[in-house]
Amino acid sequence: MPWLQLKVIAPRRYVESIENALLAAGAASVTLQDNADQPIFEPGLGETPLWDNVKITGLFDAEIDTAKAIALAERRFGNPLPQHQWEQLEDKDWEREWMSNYHAIRCGERLWICPSWQEPPEPDKINLMLDPGLAFGTGTHPTTFLCMQWIDQQDFTDLEVIDYGCGSGILGIAALLLGARKVVGVDIDPQALLATTENAKRNQLPADAMPVYLPPHCPATQVDVMLANILAGPLAELAPTLSNMTKPGGKLCLSGILSVQAQSVMDAYAPWFDFDPVATHEEWVRLTAIKARA
């Protein structure tokens, strides 16, 4: 089905009003994008930050009367729309287009992340078959890649692992494929738990190899390796919890952390862990550590 896009450039103070105006004019959806190159880092609690200048894009049926749509939007907005233009959205098989742009990723000497619709480039390696879906974690993000590189270098034989904030389950599944006896997946998002379970099945892992839980239901246990690729704020808050769930002498691998946030996260875990040198990829870091023995 062909579509038209109405793109409006506006200061952030007008975003909500213009978004509502486009929906009132018949937009099927509205998306917001940065109109410059302004980064937004992790927000504080209760904050919903936006860029100073925002590109607001409304998606309309190609048969719409564009002049009428503009008139309806401006009536709802109460003023002429700021800088705007219509664009034809090419009619494509978007699923096939997306699939063609997602490729296998090598994560070290042993591990590959492979989309399930492609043949693994190196069939004799350990190939984690993944269908990226609604949950975070495909290997393309620097934080996931950093964690996967570290996992590739470890001996997981017969170890127990927690993947805290499991997303797609990619980190925990990699540990299982490298010999871990059991991995527990934990996430606040039920969709992530479903994605993890489906991806574990896709990799032909036993049904009981990776049980998944919402945090309140996670069993009280201690594991040999703690993996957590989330965000700096939650990681710092979770330091006592993740420490209690890690055995003395156990390993910790954290990411989802910007370089400028690394020290504050390390400080939160310092009472329990001794850190290795920081690993960096682009503006992101990976922190690894050993829990001090009692």
UniProtKB/Swiss-Prot annotation:
Keywords, in A-Z order: Cytoplasm, Methyltransferase, S-adenosyl-L-methionine, Transferase
Q: Which residues form a coiled coil?
A: none
Q: Does the keyword Transferase apply?
A: yes
Q: Which reaction does it catalyse?
A: L-lysyl-[protein] + 3 S-adenosyl-L-methionine = N(6),N(6),N(6)-trimethyl-L-lysyl-[protein] + 3 S-adenosyl-L-homocysteine + 3 H(+)
**Which locations, inside or outside the cell, does it occupy?**
Cytoplasm
Binding site residues for S-adenosyl-L-methionine? T144, G165, D187, N229
Group of enzyme by EC: transferase
Its Enzyme Commission number(s) read 2.1.1.-
| GO terms for MF | protein-lysine N-methyltransferase activity
The record's GO CC annotations read: cytosol
Q: Which GO terms describe its biological process?
A: methylation
Name the InterPro entries on file: Ribosomal_L11_MeTrfase_PrmA (IPR050078), Ribosomal_PrmA_MeTrfase (IPR004498), SAM-dependent_MTases_sf (IPR029063)
Family statement drawn from the similarity comment of this UniProt entry? Belongs to the methyltransferase superfamily. PrmA family.
* Protein function: Methylates ribosomal protein L11.
Protein name stated in the entry? Ribosomal protein L11 methyltransferase
Gene it is expressed from: prmA
